[in-house]
Amino acid sequence: MTSQARIPLWIVAVVVGLGVVTVVGLFFYGSYTGLGAPV
């Protein structure tokens, strides 16, 4: 594993951030529309 083969930290942060935003967004959207069941 060379330093070039490693995934940049900012890419990991962006992917994780988008994942969290998507999950939270779907949860609040489901709750707002009345379709979201309590997790």
From Swiss-Prot:
Family named by the database record: Belongs to the PsbJ family.
Coiled coil: none
Subunit structure: PSII is composed of 1 copy each of membrane proteins PsbA, PsbB, PsbC, PsbD, PsbE, PsbF, PsbH, PsbI, PsbJ, PsbK, PsbL, PsbM, PsbT, PsbX, PsbY, PsbZ, Psb30/Ycf12, peripheral proteins PsbO, CyanoQ (PsbQ), PsbU, PsbV and a large number of cofactors. It forms dimeric complexes.
A GO biological-process term: photosynthesis
Keywords: Membrane, Photosynthesis, Photosystem II, Reaction center, Thylakoid, Transmembrane, Transmembrane helix
Subcellular location: Cellular thylakoid membrane
Membrane topology summary: Single-pass membrane protein
Protein name: Photosystem II reaction center protein J
PANTHER family assigned: PHOTOSYSTEM II REACTION CENTER PROTEIN J (PTHR34812:SF3)
An example Gene Ontology CC term for this record: plasma membrane-derived thylakoid membrane
Gene this protein is translated from: psbJ
Function: One of the components of the core complex of photosystem II (PSII). PSII is a light-driven water:plastoquinone oxidoreductase that uses light energy to abstract electrons from H(2)O, generating O(2) and a proton gradient subsequently used for ATP formation. It consists of a core antenna complex that captures photons, and an electron transfer chain that converts photonic excitation into a charge separation.
Parts of the chain that traverse the membrane: 7-27
